[in-house]
UniProtKB/Swiss-Prot annotation:
Pathway: Cofactor biosynthesis; methanofuran biosynthesis; Cofactor biosynthesis; coenzyme A biosynthesis. Its EC number is 4.1.1.11, 4.1.1.25. This is Probable L-tyrosine/L-aspartate decarboxylase. It catalyses: L-tyrosine + H(+) = tyramine + CO2; L-aspartate + H(+) = beta-alanine + CO2. Signal peptide: none annotated. It is an enzyme of class 4 (lyase). Keywords: Decarboxylase, Lyase, Pyridoxal phosphate. The gene is mfnA. One of its GO terms (biological process) is coenzyme A biosynthetic process.
């Protein structure tokens, strides 16, 4: 095949994909990247952060990006990496937890909520972790009292806690402030999965915050050891650009393995070969948008979220919980059936595990007309 024939055939495959701007993707936490990312991607497409000595400029960019993201999370001196996504970030945190607890002679008992991302199921399987699942409150957050009592009764057998800041299904935020206190009092590691919420919560206008809800989640809390945060979600970076940040570089020695044939003799990330595109794109987009740009982005998405909730209620649909961020769960006892009917109309939503509900993520690519069209189709599925 010649080059043009190859490109034409590839274009036919690409045309089978959904496009974010069409508005039919309502269940994804990713969105159309910022347009500048295309130019940056071309500039950095051959870089490999797995061998940083060969790509010194890109490696410097990664350190700068980690510091920039750390600044959002109240710790410019954080240590970490931009990696493939939230799954690798959570696996990395759990690997550090396991190795630290082993060094202290403690069992690998980790408290992880039912609302946690399925990447923690992978961590449990790969690392043979012992997972404790606390009950949930009516707000779909971990029961802090249960955790306190469990740790007290277990006589120092718990080595780590995972809290969620923007759970995948509902957007709920665990009481990280209280979990932080527990972690400090009991010398326990605390990882926060803010893969989605990390680029939402810091920019959320107070008018969208729920009364009595604690939105604190980052390194300003002394007990927080590590945070997952993904620029390729609400950060507008291209896939793949996930982030794992640790409070300081003390954690590095629990991640390093020898890599004698590379320009640096140790490597800490799970994936060895890492493109620099995610790093460079994140750097550029964060520099371009700044705090003001992200505040506008998040609060426009929240405005559309409130519109969706209001219109859904006019159609007779109710939410499982009031939206904590730009994620909406609409109650539906026949969620799987409804999901498939909507797919027949080309609407791609997802379903919640922890409650009978459809899950809609109001990402920046969604417009009001898309929301109106979706709700009309959803209403029509209930007429038959």
């Amino acid at each position: 095949m010649d080059e043009q024939d190859i490109l034409n055939e590839l274009r036919e495959y690409r045309n089978q994909d959904l496009k974010y701007e069409e508005g039919y993707i309502l269940g994804s936490m990713c969105t159309k990247p910022h347009p500048m990312a295309r130019k940056i991607s071309e500039m950095f497409f051959e870089t490999n952060l797995g061998d940083p000595g060969l790509f010194k400029g890109t490696s410097k960019l990664e350190k700068e990006v980690v510091s920039m993201i750390g600044g959002i999370l109240h710790n410019k001196n954080a240590f970490g990496y931009l990696i493939s996504g939230g799954t690798e970030a959570n696996l990395t945190a759990m690997r550090a937890f396991k190795n630290i607890s082993k060094s202290k002679g403690k069992p690998q008992n980790i408290i992880i909520p039912e609302t946690a991302h399925f990447s923690f199921d992978k961590a449990k399987d790969m690392m043979d972790l012992n997972v404790v699942r606390p009950p949930l409150t009516k707000y779909f957050t971990m029961d802090v009292k249960f955790i306190k009592d469990y740790i007290e009764d277990s006589k120092n057998e718990v080595s780590g806690i995972v809290g969620i800041a923007g759970c995948t299904e509902l957007g709920s935020i665990d009481n990280i402030c209280e979990l932080s206190k527990i972690a400090v009092e009991n010398d326990i590691l605390l990882h926060v999965d803010a893969a989605f919420g990390g680029f939402v919560i810091p920019f959320l206008d107070d008018k969208y915050k729920l009364d009595g809800y604690n939105y604190d989640f980052d390194f300003s809390l002394n007990g927080v050891s590590s945070i997952t945060i993904d620029p390729h979600k609400m950060g507008l970076a291209p896939i793949s650009a996930g982030g794992i940040l640790f409070r300081d570089n003390m954690f590095k020695k629990y991640l390093d393995v020898d890599a004698p044939y590379l320009t640096e003799k140790q490597q800490a990330t799970i994936i060895g070969t890492r493109s620099g595109v995610g790093v460079a794109s994140t750097w550029g987009i964060m520099k371009l948008l700044g705090i003001d740009g992200y505040e506008t982005l998040v609060n426009e998405s929240m405005e559309k979220t409130m519109y969706l909730v209001k219109k859904a209620r006019e159609y007779g649909f109710e939410t499982a919980i009031d939206p904590v961020m730009n994620i909406v769960a609409l109650n539906d006892e026949n969620k799987h059936d409804t999901c498939m009917k909507l797919r027949d109309e080309n609407w791609y939503v997802s379903v919640c595990r922890c409650v009978d509900a459809l899950r809609i993520v109001v990402m920046p690519h969604l417009e009001i007309e898309h929301i109106d069209g979706f709700l009309e189709s959803l209403s029509n599925t209930k007429k038959y």
